[in-house]
Amino acid sequence: MGSVDPSRLSLVLFARLSGLVVAVSVLYWALFLPNLGLSYSTLHPLLMVIGFILVSGEAILIHRWLPGSRKTKKAVHLWLQGMALASAVFGIWTKFHYQRGVFANFYSLHSWMGLLSVSLFAAQWVTGFMSFWHRGEVRTTRTTFLPWHVFLGLYTYGLAIATAETGLLEKLTFLQTKRNVPRRGSESMTVNGLGLGLALLGCIVITAAILPKYQSHSRDEKLVYSSQDRPKCLSS
């Protein structure tokens, strides 16, 4: 069991602070500014931003700060990603239920990017479970798939944030043109601040995931792990 390097917690702390700003912003925007309360229209941004983006970001950071065995980290990572996937699916369902139709919703770049990001996330979760949790896969297969799992996970996370940004722009454009929301009003400023917070959050989470300084295992631990799990060759 490796100890947590205090220097590694700096980016995690910044990620938590930016995530808190994002959560407060989307809650304030969805529940208080339109004066609609909790409804299907307000559930969509809440589930997609807090349930999908924030929870999946926390799942990525699990490997950077959580002390314990690799099995414990993988289990927490798996369950958090499963929660994020469930929130994303439910968030899409609320949009369909609110607009009364499936095909009527798929007309914009935001809708197509959302479908792509959730589909990739679901495929990533299933393949990750089969490769790293299910014991049927051989060690060499998991080792080969690991770089692709990391890359596709970060790509999908970035795509989800980009999708949220297009959704914010689409919604703000509608509010300003159809409902005469002031460009410098509180709602416009809140949406713009939410977009900046999401961009900052994505940058911090991805940086913490790819920088060697913030990886959870030391070099000596990796060498021991590699020597123990290296497949043996049978001589003929």
Swiss-Prot record:
E.C. code: 7.2.1.3
Domain of life: Eukaryota
Residues annotated for heme b 1 binding in this entry: H44, H110
Cofactor dependency: heme b
GO molecular function, one term: metal ion binding
Note on cofactor: Binds 2 heme b groups non-covalently.
InterPro entries reported in the protein's UniProt record: CYB561/CYBRD1-like, Cyt_b561/ferric_Rdtase_TM
Cytochrome b561 domain sequence ranges: 14-210
Keywords, alphabetical: Electron transport, Heme, Iron, Membrane, Metal-binding, Translocase, Transmembrane, Transmembrane helix, Transport
Chain segments annotated as transmembrane: 17-37, 42-62, 76-96, 112-132, 144-164, 191-211
Subcellular location: Membrane
Entry's Gene Ontology cellular component terms: membrane
Enzyme class: translocase
Subunit structure: Homodimer.
PANTHER family: CYTOCHROME B561-RELATED, TRANSMEMBRANE ASCORBATE FERRIREDUCTASE 4-RELATED
Function field: Two-heme-containing cytochrome. May catalyze ascorbate-dependent trans-membrane ferric-chelate reduction.
Protein name: Probable transmembrane ascorbate ferrireductase 4
Lineage: Eukaryota, Viridiplantae, Streptophyta, Embryophyta, Tracheophyta
